[in-house]
């Protein structure tokens, strides 16, 4: 079991270094989120690669998890006021007064996207290391 854990850490470290070298400023920066730092593997939300995240989201590290988090791109908040939902938020004049997943719509911050997005399923060719890692994690349970 310790061998699998060490192997897991090695693979994770390789991915982390590999991903950091490919980061683009156009993707925005990872926001600080109030998300659990408990190490739980949730196949729907844990990402390993940026290409698993939808447009406007970035694969960010939170504790020992990696999630597709909403980001601003070139300081612009993505989304449309037509898609806004939720209760009226705080008063605003511009998007920069709102959180990254909100826009200033009718002088109120409104949620236009989710803070955390589900990951996209990768094609078989691009997900070999992801599948291997998930199988490895399953073995250790």
Swiss-Prot record:
MF annotations from Gene Ontology: peptidase inhibitor activity
Pfam families this protein is in?
A: WAP
Disulfide bridge partners, by residue number: 30-60, 39-64, 47-59, 53-68, 81-105, 92-104
Q: Which residues form the signal peptide?
A: 1-19
Q: Which Gene3D superfamilies match?
A: Elafin-like
Entry keyword annotation includes Phosphoprotein = no
- Determine the domain of life of the protein's source: Eukaryota
Cross-referenced InterPro entries, in alphabetical order? Answer: Elafin-like_sf, WAP_dom
Cellular component per GO? Answer: extracellular region
Tissue expression as described in the entry: Component of the organic matrix of calcified shell layers like nacre and prisms.
Q: What is its main location?
A: secreted
Q: Do the record's keywords include Signal?
A: yes
Q: Which UniProt keywords apply?
A: Disulfide bond, Secreted, Signal
The protein's location, in the record's own words, is: Secreted
Q: Where is the WAP domain?
A: 23-71
Q: What is this protein called?
A: Perlwapin-like protein
Give the classification, highest ranks: Eukaryota, Metazoa, Spiralia, Lophotrochozoa, Mollusca
């Amino acid at each position: 079991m310790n061998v699998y854990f060490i192997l897991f850490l090695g693979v994770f470290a390789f991915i982390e270094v590999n991903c950091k070298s490919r980061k683009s400023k156009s993707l925005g920066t990872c926001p600080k989120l109030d998300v659990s730092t408990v190490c739980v593997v949730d196949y729907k939300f844990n990402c390993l690669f940026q290409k698993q995240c939808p447009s406007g989201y970035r694969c960010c590290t939170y504790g020992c998890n990696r999630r597709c988090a909403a980001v601003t791109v070139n300081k612009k908040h993505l989304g449309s006021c037509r898609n806004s939902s939720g209760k009226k938020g705080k008063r605003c004049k511009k998007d920069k007064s709102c959180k990254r997943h909100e826009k200033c719509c009718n002088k109120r911050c409104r949620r236009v996207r989710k803070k955390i997005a589900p990951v996209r399923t990768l094609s078989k060719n691009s997900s070999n290391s992801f599948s291997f890692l998930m199988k490895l994690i399953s073995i250790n349970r």
